[in-house]
């Protein structure tokens, strides 16, 4: 079985979502996990979640004689990548940065947009952003996207006692 399929089967079987998987230099395998959309109310992935998945993956990769040196399992972070249509559904209403493969002629030939994700309609994705002439809406498909990720929302103000 291919390494990516092996990792996805294991992670999904444990009740998590495989967000991304990378094979880096010197045999490093990085796995990014999150809760499934149904379990999103559990909050953020914890160290204990990563530890459980790491432990299981180590066993599976050893049994399957997979070629790797080191394994890292972590959460996708605050700037979580958006790769699947289900990601755009799940994070509708969130702020995101979307970089397209080709410039959009109806948007001043820009390729990079930051704005609020809208609920997808079929295969059509949408992002509301601040254009030169005020609020604008960009419609695109998953095939148009080069990279996309959430924009971290961090509040550095301390709570008042």
UniProtKB/Swiss-Prot annotation:
InterPro entries: Ribosome_maturation_RimP (IPR003728), RimP_C (IPR028998), RimP_C_sf (IPR036847), RimP_N (IPR028989), RimP_N_sf (IPR035956). It is found in: Cytoplasm. Pfam families: DUF150_C, RimP_N. GO terms for biological process: ribosomal small subunit assembly; translation. GO terms for cellular component: cytosol. The keyword Transit peptide does not apply. Keywords: Cytoplasm, Ribosome biogenesis. Required for maturation of 30S ribosomal subunits. PANTHER family: RIBOSOME MATURATION FACTOR RIMP (PTHR33867:SF1). Belongs to the RimP family. This is Ribosome maturation factor RimP. It comes from Janthinobacterium sp. (strain Marseille). The gene is rimP.
């Amino acid at each position: 079985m291919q390494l990516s399929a092996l990792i996805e089967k294991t992670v999904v079987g444990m009740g998590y979502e495989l967000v991304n998987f990378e094979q880096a230099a010197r045999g490093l395998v990085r796995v990014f996990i999150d809760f499934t959309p149904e379990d999103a109310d559990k909050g953020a992935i914890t160290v204990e979640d990563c530890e459980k998945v790491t432990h299981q993956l180590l066993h599976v990769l050893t049994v399957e004689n997979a070629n790797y040196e080191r394994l890292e399992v972590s959460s996708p972070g605050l700037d979580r990548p958006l790769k699947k249509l289900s990601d755009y559904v799940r994070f509708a209403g969130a702020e995101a940065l979307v970089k397209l493969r080709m410039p959009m002629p109806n948007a001043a030939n820009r390729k990079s947009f930051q704005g609020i994700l809208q609920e997808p309609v079929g295969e059509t994705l949408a992002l509301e952003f601040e254009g030169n002439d005020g609020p604008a809406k960009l419609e695109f498909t998953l095939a148009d996207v080069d990279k996309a990720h959430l924009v971290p929302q961090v509040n550095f103000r301390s709570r008042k006692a």
